[in-house]
UniProtKB/Swiss-Prot annotation:
It is a multi-pass membrane protein. CDD domains: NDFIP2 (cd22306). Induction: By T-cell activation. It comes from Homo sapiens. It is found in: Endosome membrane; Golgi apparatus membrane; Endosome, Multivesicular body membrane. One of its GO terms (biological process) is negative regulation of protein transport. Changing Y167F: Loss of NDFIP2 phosphorylation by SRC. A motif (PPxY motif 2) lies at residues 174-177. Residues 1-24, 37-156 are annotated as: Disordered. This is NEDD4 family-interacting protein 2. The gene is NDFIP2. Residues 78-99 have a biased composition (Basic and acidic residues). The modification Phosphotyrosine is found at Y151, Y167, Y171, Y177. Forms heterodimers with NDFIP1. Interacts with HECT domain-containing E3 ubiquitin-protein ligases, including NEDD4. Interacts with NEDD4L. Interacts with PTEN. When phosphorylated at Tyr-167, interacts with SRC and LYN SH2 domain. May thus act as a scaffold that recruits SRC to NDFIP1, enhancing NDFIP1 phosphorylation. Interacts with SLC11A2/DMT1. May interact with phosphorylated EGFR. Interacts with KCNH2.
Length: 336
């Protein structure tokens, strides 16, 4: 039985060697199975070596042939592994599920990193765990580079006193909560409402007065109607008194002061009284006014009224101007 097993091993050795050398593109699983079967056959042959060795030696060197065949099987398995390891991968990105743990791996890094976008091929090693750890540690490093800076590195600008003053000027500080939420009583609310209505009414009346009599800022003091002085009053008075109605028109139209106009009125009234007396006591007009005394009295009273009106109004205006000397740009209008 032992001789038959050794012959079977010797016969199967060359066939296994030829199959291992002739099929280098077989999968890793076939090479591994051949290696395992060769090891099992070698172990069986080594256990029964003493009787088999004698048989092989007696049979013309069958024992060395079996040893050579087992060695050839091991060499063929190694060549098969090398050929499989050197075979190019048609698809680098796809991993073959039939390959064992000693195959090739492709580590995919962060796609956002343009500098490391190409695939990195790692050689087959027995311990790929440190490389995976290194790749995993490089990925968080890239993520931490894009993270925001810590809060301690951010500098906060403290507003200065000038900025605070400017902010307080444009944005006043609101009152405290106790003051803002405290409601006034009914009497206080009514008083505040009455005061607001009075202020609004005063403002409305002042606005209406300004609209009705707008101030004329385009006039200067020389163009305004001023009071005048006593000299202008006497000049206009004598012009109207001497030249009668012609002097009255000239003095009233030329002068632009209250004194000149009231002086012209006063002089014209006195001139009218003068001519009434002349006509009454003259011998030239005895035939015209002897029976018409009422007409004389009418002109005499009219002259007296004009004289006293001009003189009295001028005195009132002068006294008023002296009492209101502090008022600036005041205008006086008096009707004749």
């Amino acid at each position: 039985m032992a001789r038959r097993r050794s012959q079977r091993v010797c016969a199967s050795g060359p066939s296994m060697l030829n199959s291992a050398r002739g099929a280098p593109e077989l999968l890793r699983g076939t090479a591994t199975n051949a290696e395992v079967s060769a090891a099992a056959a070698g172990a069986t042959g080594s256990e029964e070596l003493p009787p088999g060795d004698r048989g092989c030696r007696n049979g013309g060197g069958r024992g060395p042939a079996a040893t050579t065949s087992s060695t050839g099987v091991a060499v063929g398995a190694e060549h098969g592994e090398d050929s499989l390891s050197r075979k190019p991968d048609p698809e680098p990105g796809r991993m073959d599920h039939h390959q064992p743990g000693t195959g090739r791996y492709q580590v995919l890094l962060n796609e956002e990193d343009n500098s490391e976008s190409s695939a990195i091929e790692q050689p087959p090693t027995s311990n790929p765990a440190p490389q995976i750890v290194q790749a995993a540690s490089s990925a968080p490093a890239l993520e931490t580079d894009s993270s925001p800076p810590p809060y301690s590195s951010i500098t906060v600008e403290v507003p200065t006193t000038s900025d605070t003053e400017v902010y307080g000027e444009f944005y006043p500080v609101p009152p405290p909560y106790s003051v803002a939420t405290s409601l006034p009583t009914y009497d206080e609310a009514e008083k505040a409402k009455a005061a607001a209505m009075a202020a609004a009414a005063a403002e409305t009346s002042q606005r209406i007065q300004e609209e009705e009599c707008p101030p004329r800022d385009d006039f200067s003091d020389a163009d305004q109607l001023r009071v005048g002085n006593d000299g202008i009053f006497m000049l206009a008075f004598f012009m109207a008194f001497i030249f009668n109605w012609l002097g009255f028109c000239l003095s009233f139209c030329i002068t632009n002061t209250i004194a000149g106009r009231y002086g012209a009125i006063c002089g014209f009234g006195l001139s009218l009284i003068k001519w009434i007396l002349i006509v009454r006591f003259s011998d030239y007009f005895t035939g015209y006014f002897n029976g018409q005394y009422w007409l004389w009295w009418i002109f005499l009273v009219l002259g007296l009224l004009l004289f006293f009106r001009g003189f009295v109004n001028y005195l009132k205006v002068r006294n008023m101007s002296e009492s209101m000397a502090a008022a600036h740009r005041t205008r006086y209008f008096f009707l004749l």
